[in-house]
From Swiss-Prot:
Keywords: Transferase. SUPFAM superfamilies: Formylmethanofuran:tetrahydromethanopterin formyltransferase. Belongs to the FTR family. NCBIfam families: PRK02114.1. GO terms for biological process: one-carbon metabolic process. This is Formylmethanofuran--tetrahydromethanopterin formyltransferase-like protein. GO terms for molecular function: formylmethanofuran-tetrahydromethanopterin N-formyltransferase activity. It comes from Methanothermobacter thermautotrophicus (strain ATCC 29096 / DSM 1053 / JCM 10044 / NBRC 100330 / Delta H). Gene3D superfamilies: 3.30.70.520. It comes from the Archaea.
Amino acid sequence: MEINGTLIEDTFSEAFTGRCVRATITARDMETVRRAALDATATPGAVIGRVEGGVESFLGGEDTPDGRPGAVVQFYYALDDMEKFQVELSYRIRQDILVKPFTALYSSTPDPDGYLDMMKHVGHCGDGYEWLEEFNGREMINVPVAVPDFKIESRMGYREAIMGANFWYMCRDPDTVLEAGRAAIRAIEEVEGVVTPFDICSAASKPETNYPWIGPTTNHPYCPSLKEVLGDESRVPEGVGYIPEIVINGLTMEALEEAMRAGIEAVCRYDGVLRVSAGNYDGKLGDHRIDLHGVLG
């Protein structure tokens, strides 16, 4: 298959099941919202047993629970230990959202499978002076802080979701890495229910490693700088000098497939993109398979 002269390999992306909390951050102004949203979702850590997240969209006051500027963010956890998820999520909330002036956080997860209690690891930042209050049908924790006050919904809904869907766009030159990648991110941002936790990712990884205490390490057959060293083991095609990756997490498979299609079609508008592929690891990463040709029809 080709799109605009770009070869689409007959392969698939492997993805895996996780848990997602979808939430809405609000603040007095959009600059504060943006800083809180980007800070809270800045470190993708699912492959090392931590939380990872992304910004789904930014909102005007007409679309938020309290009429202020806002952002929809998603936080993902790949393990079934919900207590650990609660702790890891609290770090993002406490260190990146609560500390920003005039912020609030509301649960926005559609059809939640369950809830994470926010009092133990976030509400008690008030050192016992926090209190509960009702706001527009939501139970909120008011955490007293020096710039009054941080408010967070007492329970955050979570649901099963899908993590790690991906595609690689193999480029001839460095300008195309950035230009095509940014076009893909913009296209994916138009799809509801998905995030790109790594933005443009320069470091595709693999499950096998010589250093297990690190976790996933570089996918060496796809490193252009190792092509001569590896010889026949190298999987870097002729003419390709760069293999960036776009990783997508989503609430549903339908949203993920729509995002994959939008992103791939976007990169294929650039002459410097020679082919598109995806990461899969013989089922070692996850139990979801997204065929590139199937997604593109």
